[in-house]
A protein has these predicted regions:
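A single, central transmembrane helix in multi-pass transporters
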Residues: 31, 166-174, 211-270
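Small-residue hotspots at the loop-to-helix junctions and early N-terminal turns
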Residues: 42-51, 144, 252-259, 343
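Juxtamembrane intracellular "pre-TM" segments in multi-pass secondary transporters
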Residues: 1-12, 192-223
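Central cavity-lining transmembrane alpha-helices of secondary-active solute carriers
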Residues: 49-68, 260-269
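Substrate-agnostic recognition of the 12-TM MFS/MFS-like secondary transporter fold
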Residues: 14-30, 53-66, 76-86, 107-165, ...
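Helix-loop junctions on the cytosolic side of multi-pass membrane transporters
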Residues: 177-201, 389-399
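C-terminal transmembrane bundle of multi-pass solute transporters/carriers
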Residues: 77-86, 91, 245-399
């Protein structure tokens, strides 16, 4: 455990620095994968599946969380995961250097899965460090701070993705490797003693985690809400890729601007999100409804510049939602259960996004981009209205 307040604050800043550099790399990677895959294959469903492959490892996130909780040296775990993530980028060299569709798809998918798996490990470690390095009364502000910095980093990553694609796939991939490798540096300077607590068996860890889920109704409701919301929002990547590249016939710069503006909105939204008080339902229900309405409105816009307006609003709403929701969740989770609980949330609530990109691609292929944006909007609105029936989540106080 960390006892010295100065050390704890320094460690938190280093954790945020690691998050920021990682987000630059992973956000650039996520857009590059969509663009590269669609350009090499010209099949939206495959591009959507490539996007979804990043979340495939989240089906096993509970086991990852259990492993991270059990590991004595979490710093070393984070370093190894970051090294593997950086090296995996070179698999893309093979994909872009061949003209055989099966080889292209295989190496792109393999790279994305490794990126997703190692990022899940890193996220689990950071979730524990956020709990350890902050006091309880700092959770909401700390969460907002991490979200704000993370979103600014995503903006940089989205801008970088456009540049990396513009300078050529091989040069861009090399530049992306440098960014991801740099994320290791802050971890090296984090000071944390190895955890000396007694360890249970993996089977006991699983039973304890599932028991905690069964007894914590707000966690069940949060997961259900995430399944619906994430299923919709995760289609956003393939939706905007096709909108910019195939419908508007614009280059990657316009594509990256979409996600830069989402991140800008999140940064702006996280400011009031860090200060808002009251019942969680009262805070997030109207925000989810507005978010859904903004997604649906994009279906009726025929200019990329007009599209940018609802995009900023979507980001702002997300930025306001996350700090109060995350602070409520963190307060309910014991430190020793943090990685496993995040693993449960990822496995049940986030892994569903594995299917989202493919579903979005199929909707586009068999109907049109118009209907995809309407479906995304409807699902987000339904997730907001569903909170009315989730008493524990709806009435949770945000102090």
């Amino acid at each position: 455990m960390i006892e010295d307040l100065g050390t704890r604050r320094k460690n938190f800043k280093l954790t945020v620095s690691n998050l920021a550099i990682s987000r630059v790399g992973t956000s650039a990677f996520s857009l590059m994968i969509l663009w590269i895959t669609l350009q090499l294959t010209h099949i939206p469903a495959i591009a959507g599946l490539a996007d979804g492959m990043f979340t495939l490892p989240l089906f096993f996130s509970f086991f990852v969380g259990s492993f991270v909780d059990r590991s004595r040296n979490k710093k070393m775990v984070a370093i190894i995961a970051s090294v593997l993530r950086s090296v995996s980028i070179f698999l893309l060299f093979i994909a872009v250097s061949t003209h055989v569709l099966a080889v292209i798809v295989f190496f792109i998918f393999l790279c994305v899965v490794i990126m997703g798996f190692t990022s899940d490990i890193s996220n689990s470690v950071r979730a524990i460090w956020e709990k350890v390095f902050l006091k309880e009364e700092e959770y909401q502000k700390g969460s907002a701070w991490m979200m704000g910095i993370g979103s600014l980093a995503e903006m940089v990553g989205f801008i970088a993705s456009g540049i990396f694609i513009y300078i050529g796939f091989l040069r861009g991939i090399s530049a992306l490797f440098v960014v991801l490798a740099a994320s290791i540096i802050p971890i090296i300077f984090i000071i944390q003693k190895p955890d000396q607590r007694e360890r249970q068996s993996v089977k006991s860890d699983m039973k304890e985690g599932l028991k905690f889920l069964k007894e914590t109704k707000i966690l069940q409701q949060m997961i259900f809400l995430m399944i619906i919301a994430n299923l919709a929002v995760a289609m956003m990547g393939i939706a905007f890729t096709v909108l910019v590249e195939e419908i508007f016939k614009l280059n990657s710069v316009y594509f990256s601007i979409v996600f830069v503006l989402v991140s800008l909105g999140i940064v702006l939204g996280s400011i009031p999100g860090s200060k808002v008080k009251g019942k969680l339902g009262v805070i997030i229900i109207p925000l989810l409804i507005v978010t859904g309405a903004m997604f649906a409105s994009i279906a009726f816009l025929h200019s990329i510049y007009l599209t940018y307006i609802p995009v900023v609003v979507i980001g702002f709403c997300v930025g306001m939602i996350n700090p109060p929701a995350e602070s409520v969740l963190i307060k309910r989770i014991p430190e020793e259960m943090m990685a496993r609980t995040i693993g449960i949330v990822n496995t049940m609530g986030v892994s569903v996004t594995f299917f989202s990109g493919t579903i979005g691609g199929l909707i586009i292929q068999f109907t049109s981009i118009f209907y995809l944006f309407l479906i995304i909007g409807a699902l987000v609105i339904l997730s907001g209205l569903g909170i009315f029936f989730m008493k524990e989540l709806r009435d949770s106080p945000v102090k």
